[in-house]
Amino acid sequence: MLAGQLEARDPKEGTHPEDPCPGAGAVMEKTAVAAEVLTEDCNTGEMPPLQQQIIRLHQELGRQKSLWADVHGKLRSHIDALREQNMELREKLRALQLQRWKARKKSAASPHAGQESHTLALEPAFGKISPLSADEETIPKYAGHKNQSATLLGQRSSSNNSAPPKPMSLKIERISSWKTPPQENRDKNLSRRRQDRRATPTGRPTPCAERRGGV
C-alpha cells in the first residue's frame, strides 16, 4: 500500500516539482521554439508576403499616429492662443464702449462744455472771446439768405442783359414811313398846287372847289 502511494506521488516525466500545474514547461518550450522559428524566418527573408505587408502597414500606422499627434498638439496650441486673443479683444471693446458711453453722458449733461474749452484754448492767442447772443447768431443766417437772393437776382439780370435786343428801330422806321410820305412826294404835291393856282384866273373856282360844289 505504501509503495503504491509513493509511486503515485512521484512526478511524471516532463514535469518539474516546483511547477504549479503539470505540463507547463512543455508549453513554454513550444512557444519559445515557435518564436525562434519566426525570428529566423524574418531574418532569412522566408516570411510569406502577406505577413510582410501586415508588418509594413503596422509600421506606417505608427508613423501616421505620431504625425497626427504632433499636428493635433500644434492645432490645440494655436486654438488656445486664438481664444486668448479673442478674449483680450472683447475686453478692449467693452472698455472702449464704456468710454464712449461716459463721454456721451458728459456731453449730454453739459452741452456748452465743449464750447467753453474751445474758447479757453483760443483766449491766449486772440484774447477774451465773448459768447454770441441769440440775435447775433441769427444775423449771419439772414445775411447768408440775402447774399444768396442777391446773387440770384444778379444772375437773372446778367442773363437778361446778355440776351439780344429786340429790333425796335425797324418798327419805328416802318411806322414813320407809313405815317409820313417821303420828301419827294411832298415837293411834287406843292409844285402841282402852285401850278394850279397860277393857271386858274381870278374869280373862277378851283377844281377842288368845283368838286366840293358838285358834291
Curated annotation (Swiss-Prot):
Residue segments, region Disordered: 1-25, 150-215
Tissue occurrence: Expressed in liver and testis. Expressed in the seminiferous tubules (at protein level).
Subunit note: Self-associates (via leucine zipper). Interacts (via leucine zipper) with ZIPK/DAPK3 (via leucine zipper). Interacts with MAD4.
Chain's gene name: TCP10L
Coiled coil residues, start to end: 69-110
Name the UniProt record assigns to this protein: T-complex protein 10A homolog 1
Cellular component terms (Gene Ontology): nucleus
InterPro entries per UniProt: TCP10L/CENPJ
Compartments in which it is found: Nucleus
Keywords: Coiled coil, Nucleus, Repressor, Transcription, Transcription regulation, Tumor suppressor
One term of GO molecular function: DNA-binding transcription factor binding
Leucine-zipper: annotated segments: 75-96
Sequence ranges of Basic and acidic residues compositional bias: 7-19
Function text: May be involved in transcriptional regulation. Has in vitro transcription inhibition activity. Acts as a tumor suppressor in hepatocellular carcinoma (HCC) cells.
GO biological process: negative regulation of transcription by RNA polymerase II
Comp. bias (Polar residues): 150-163
Family: Belongs to the TCP10 family.
